[in-house]
Every structure is written in C-alpha cells, then in structure tokens.
Regions:
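Amphipathic alpha-helical coiled-coil segments
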Residues: 12-26, 79, 83-104, 112-115, ...
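Periplasmic alpha-helical coiled-coil/stalk elements that build and connect Gram-negative outer-membrane
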Residues: 82-198, 288-291, 295
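Glycine-centered coil turns and helix-coil junctions that link the paired helices
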Residues: 54-55, 121-124, 253, 320
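Short flexible linkers and secondary-structure junctions
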Residues: 1-93, 100, 105, 129, ...
Length: 365
C-alpha cells in the first residue's frame, strides 16, 4: 500500500515520463525562417530558409536523452528502496512499542497488586513506612511507563496509516528476530552485493551521461547545413537558381575545445563522485553488517541463557518473598531487574532487525 500511495514514487515516475518526452525533443530541428525581401528593388519576394545541425549531433542528443531517462529510472529505484526502508523501520518501531507495552502492562498489574498489599500490611503494622512507600513509588514509576507506552503504540499505528494511506485499524505481527540473506560469520564486504546496488548504479549512470555529453560536444565541431528558397533576380528566374545551400565553417575552433574540455572535466567530477559514493556505501555496509553481527551474537546469548536466567530470577524471588526472606524493597528491585532483562532482549531484536533493514536498503531490496 505504501508503494501505491507514495507521492515520492509518483513524482519519480513522472520524472521518467518527462525524460522520455525529452528523448523526442532531442531530434527536433529549428523552426524555418520565412523571408520577405526585395532583392532587385522592383518587387517583394517570399523566401524560406531551414538550418540543420550535422546529423551526428541529433544522434548524440538522442543518446544523451536516453541515458538521462535511465538515470531517472535508477533514481526511482533509490526512492523506492528508501521508502521501503522507512516503512519497515516505522513498522519495526511499532512492533517494539507493542511488545514493550505488553511488558509494562504485565509489570504494572503485578506492581499494582504488590502496592495494594503493601498498604494493607503497613496498616496492619507488618511492614514499615519505607517498604510501603517504596512499593508505592515503584508502582507509580511503572504505571507512568505503561501509560506512556500506550501513547507510543497509538503513534506507531498513525505512522503506518500515514504511509499506507488507510484509516482502518491495523495491527502488526509479533516482534521476532528477522531473517536475511546475509552471512554473519565475518564482516568482509560483499563486492557482488555492493556492485549491484541502486545507489552505485546511479553513480555509474551519471558517468555514462558525462561520457555521452563529451561525444555530443565533439560532434558539434562538424559543420551545420542550411537550405532555402528565395528569388534573387527577376520573376522569370528558373527554379533551380532560386535555391540556396549553406555550410557553416567551424572557424572559431577554440570555442569548441573549451566546451569539450568542460564536458571532460564534468566526467572527472562524476568519476570522483562515483568513487566517493562507493566508499561511503562500503562504509555503511560494513557498519550495518558489524551491527548485525554484534546483535546476532547478543541475541544468541539472551535466547540461550539470558531470558531463562531472568525467568529463574523471577521464580526464585517469588519463593523468597513468599517465605518472608525478601522484603518489598529487595523483591521489587529483583523483579524490576528481571523485567529489564526482557526489555533489553526486545531492544536487541529491534536493533538486529534494523541492521537487516539497513542492509536491505543498501542493496535495494
């Protein structure tokens, strides 16, 4: 839906269409010149004159316009990849907001029960003021976080609705570790992946345009042609003698050399820009792949040990509190730590998935 309703993609599509129309314009010739002139001083005669560039100029202009259309197409691919990345990121953040909201809701319900129990025990003289106040304070903190998380969930849905252009209530899938066609055994740059990216293709196409521009400027060195019709004498002048033919002579050759040199300089600029773009793309790729590897290893630890230890910590603290070996302060502190571990896991899943989204964007998926 986001791809269908995107104004950016529509604009990119219209730019491609505009460039295709410019391909037709590349072979247009100048308007003819109509002449009304008295060549003999006795009568007025009508003439017409038409100028043409050397045929190679039109061919090169056509080729340059075609390459510009390809560049616009490459730009639209980048726009599409960027839009996909934005929507995926917004969707991922929404998934995280919902997962965290559920965690806060569970913690809020539990801490509410403990806060009320602490109030009753304080009134019964079973605990002191510090324990009761600490239980109330922790519940207030958690409840505030829970209310805030509800706002985040609503904001996430509005963001997705904005991207998709729908007003219907929608709900995302569960937040889970993503999968991608990437190898995380090392962080060596994948040259095949880099070489096939829309971003690099855009830079390479810019070089091709500069090369075609040089060819066009060189073709302008060739002479232009002029043909026309005008009666230069009396009314009985034979028709063949009324025709005129002209040929422009590229006498001021240094002017063409300047234009060619400028086009060659632009090609060098395009090549440097392409090299800089590749360098930046490689750096972004390495950074995203390093992040993915880092979060991948962290998730393996949490799924193998961290989450299980958090659950064991919660169960042990429940037993200790029920047996009277933990007071409210120690019990609530332990529960808070256990819930925090679970939220850290959710954030790791988000960070790992975000690294995959970045890698997908860089290769145009």
């Amino acid at each position: 839906l986001a791809m269908d309703t995107s104004f950016q993609l529509r604009a990119a599509g219209m730019q491609i269409e505009a460039d295709r129309l410019m391909e037709r314009k590349a072979t247009h010739i100048p308007d003819p010149e109509l002449i009304l002139e008295s060549t003999t001083g006795d009568f007025m005669t009508i003439g017409v004159q038409q100028s043409f560039d050397f045929p190679t100029v039109y061919a090169r202009q056509k080729q340059l316009a075609q390459q510009q259309t390809i560049l616009s197409t490459q730009a639209s691919h980048i726009t599409a990849a960027a839009l996909k990345s934005k929507v995926r990121t917004a969707y991922l953040e929404w998934q995280l907001d919902i997962a965290e909201m559920r965690q806060w809701k569970t913690q809020d319900s539990l801490f509410n029960i403990l806060s009320q129990a602490a109030d009753r025990q304080y009134l019964a003289g079973q605990i002191d003021f510090v324990e009761k106040t600490y239980a109330n304070l922790k519940f207030s903190e958690v409840h505030t976080q829970y209310i805030t998380s509800l706002t985040g969930v609503q904001k996430g849905m509005q963001q997705i609705q904005l991207y998709t252009g729908t007003t219907d209530s929608i709900y995302p899938s569960e937040l889970e570790r993503g999968t991608g066609d990437f190898t995380f055994s090392n962080v060596v740059v994948d040259d095949d992946a880099i070489n096939n990216t829309p971003i690099l293709a855009y830079y390479q196409q810019s070089e091709k345009i500069s090369e075609k521009a040089i060819q066009l400027e060189r073709s302008k060195v060739f002479p232009d042609f002029t043909i026309g019709y005008l009666n230069p004498a009396d009314k009985n002048t034979p028709f063949p003698l009324r025709l005129r033919f002209g040929l422009s002579v590229p006498l001021w050759f240094w002017q063409y050399g300047t234009s060619i040199k400028a086009a060659e300089t632009k090609l060098e600029v395009a090549r440097y820009t392409s090299s800089a773009g590749r360098q930046e793309l490689t750096q972004q790729w390495l950074e995203a792949k390093n992040d993915a590897l880092k979060y991948y290893e962290a998730l393996n630890y949490f799924e193998a040990e961290g989450l299980a230890q958090a659950n064991e910590l919660t169960e042990a603290s429940n037993r200790m509190f029920a047996a009277g070996q933990y007071d409210y302060i120690k019990y609530l502190t332990t529960l808070t730590d256990a819930f925090q571990v679970k939220r850290q896991y959710l954030e790791l899943v988000r960070n790992y998935n975000q690294a995959l989204i970045t890698l997908q964007y860089l290769i145009g998926q």
